[in-house]
């Protein structure tokens, strides 16, 4: 419970202008992009420094008040939903890039810098931050840390964890630590940095981030490859890698995903034909155009072994931007059309055809339609289960059964239930599908060491039986 005394203490720390108790503001900060769920905190604070956050956490720790870190609210797993009320701690004022280190190819940034803003800032110095989530124009770097975000270029360049060198973190008791060192190598003790990445705000609050950068890449070639059968598109993915090509992006989109999105963003009809069940969007990048064209031709020779239609080589910036606009707006297009649930399955890429066929069969069994797309190059398939004309009873009763079977199928294919969206609130009850009791217990013991009073984003990641 937030008493008037506690509220006054929070005001003393951040100032009255940055403490909010009105219903409208609390509701706005009590939702992200997860379905239509709203869980507002009891009070919202907007600190401006690690020191202010430390002072807030000391109060929360003393009075055992839940604290939910809040970023850009673009998440898809309910990670910022304050299901136990308490303090909503918005990081939006920690929004500065502190240093771009051109000598060491590093950047030091605060957590509320928008991912695309950081990418553009380092690009001006001839550097490259590859992590490329679809929400890069609005999501925060801190949120990328919390979820271990990936995106289209993860297939070649890796995900967030591959670029995080060091983190400043405020612990649940208010202590401030650095998790590692600003070095490419570190074999000194347990890796606290990597433990924090993907921890979804359950272990501490990240207040400063040191990221590795790469030299900028100068050129890319983009192919739009239509397939008559969606399982053929899925099968072509591993064949491209087997031929010795590692694309910088390899995206799968089934027909409905493209059709809905083309209307949503007004993409010309030339990119879609009625007889095509799915497309692959394949990019190769590098500094030598001649080599890229050789790689593109090799990809073409691979996919010609499958049932494909005419391939488009996107050779202008307008074409490339339009195709990426199409891909990046699928989730929003689905959201505009119907109520939906989005799952984030990931399997070894060779198993993609089995996963795709299985998902469609499960949908038929339980009476729901799914729209599939995703980062096929790393086996990550987003499954949008859409309500359309399903009854409310069927939506509430049949869909959860189908989701459970989809996750069981994913596990049987040596995959897991989230590739980049995280577990948060909406997936936590499915964790026993992929982890044994022993494995879950080990993870929960780590949580308890960091957070003995269970105040740090409680009710997330672990099944309900663990949150006590």
What are these regions (language model features)?
Residues 21-29, 215, 224-226, 234-402, ...:
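C-terminal substrate-recognition/cap domain of FAD-linked oxidoreductases
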Residues 175, 428-468:
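Activity-critical C-terminal alpha-helical subdomain
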Residues 1-58, 75-105, 257-269, 317-341, ...:
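N-terminal flexible segment immediately upstream of the FAD-binding catalytic core
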Residues 60, 383, 451:
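Conserved, mostly hydrophobic/aromatic
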Residues 375, 416-423, 458-459:
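Short acidic/histidine-rich active-site segments
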């Amino acid at each position: 419970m937030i008493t008037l005394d506690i509220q006054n203490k929070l005001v003393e720390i951040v100032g009255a202008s940055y403490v909010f108790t009105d219903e409208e503001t609390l509701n706005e900060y009590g939702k992200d992009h997860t379905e239509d769920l709203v869980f507002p905190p009891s009070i919202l604070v907007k600190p401006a420094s690690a020191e202010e956050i430390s002072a807030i956490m000391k109060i929360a720790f003393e009075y055992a008040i839940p604290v939910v870190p809040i970023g850009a609210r673009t998440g898809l797993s309910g990670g910022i939903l304050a299901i136990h009320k308490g303090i909503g701690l918005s990081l939006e004022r920690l929004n500065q890039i502190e240093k771009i280190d051109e000598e060491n190819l590093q950047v030091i940034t605060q957590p509320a810098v928008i991912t695309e803003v950081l990418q553009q800032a380092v690009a001006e110095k001839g550097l490259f931050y590859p992590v490329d989530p679809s929400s890069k124009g609005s999501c925060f770097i801190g949120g990328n840390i919390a979820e271990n975000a990936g995106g289209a270029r993860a297939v070649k360049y890796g995900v967030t964890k591959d670029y995080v060198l060091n983190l400043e973190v405020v612990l649940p008791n208010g202590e401030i630590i650095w998790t590692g060192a600003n070095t490419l190598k570190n074999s000194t003790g347990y890796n606290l940095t990597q433990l924090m990445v993907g921890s979804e705000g359950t272990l501490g609050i990240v207040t400063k981030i040191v990221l590795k950068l790469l030299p900028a890449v100068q050129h890319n070639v983009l192919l739009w490859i239509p397939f008559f059968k969606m399982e053929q598109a899925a099968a072509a993915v591993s064949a491209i890698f087997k031929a010795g090509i590692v694309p910088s992006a390899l995206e799968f989109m089934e027909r409905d995903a493209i059709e809905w999105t083309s209307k949503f963003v007004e993409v010309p009809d030339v990119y879609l034909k009625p007889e095509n069940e799915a497309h692959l969007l394949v990019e190769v990048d590098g500094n030598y155009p001649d080599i890229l064209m050789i790689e593109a031709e090799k990809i073409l020779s691979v996919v010609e072994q499958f049932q494909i239609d005419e391939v488009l080589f996107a050779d202008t910036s307008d074409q490339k931007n339009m195709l990426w606009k199409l891909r990046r707006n699928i989730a929003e297009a689905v959201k505009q059309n119907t109520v939906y649930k989005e799952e984030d399955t990931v399997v070894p890429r060779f198993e993609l055809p089995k996963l795709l066929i299985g998902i469609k069969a499960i949908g038929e069994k339980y009476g729901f339609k799914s729209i599939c797309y995703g980062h096929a190059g790393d086996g990550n398939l987003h499954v949008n289960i859409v309500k359309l004309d399903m009854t409310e009873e069927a939506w509430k009763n049949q869909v959860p059964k189908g989701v459970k079977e989809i996750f069981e199928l994913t596990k049987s294919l040596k995959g897991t239930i989230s590739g980049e969206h995280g577990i948060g609130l909406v997936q936590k009850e499915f964790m026993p599908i992929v982890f044994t009791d022993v494995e879950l217990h080990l993870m929960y013991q780590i949580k308890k060491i960091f957070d003995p009073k269970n105040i740090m984003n409680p009710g997330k990641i672990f099944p309900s039986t663990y949150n006590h």
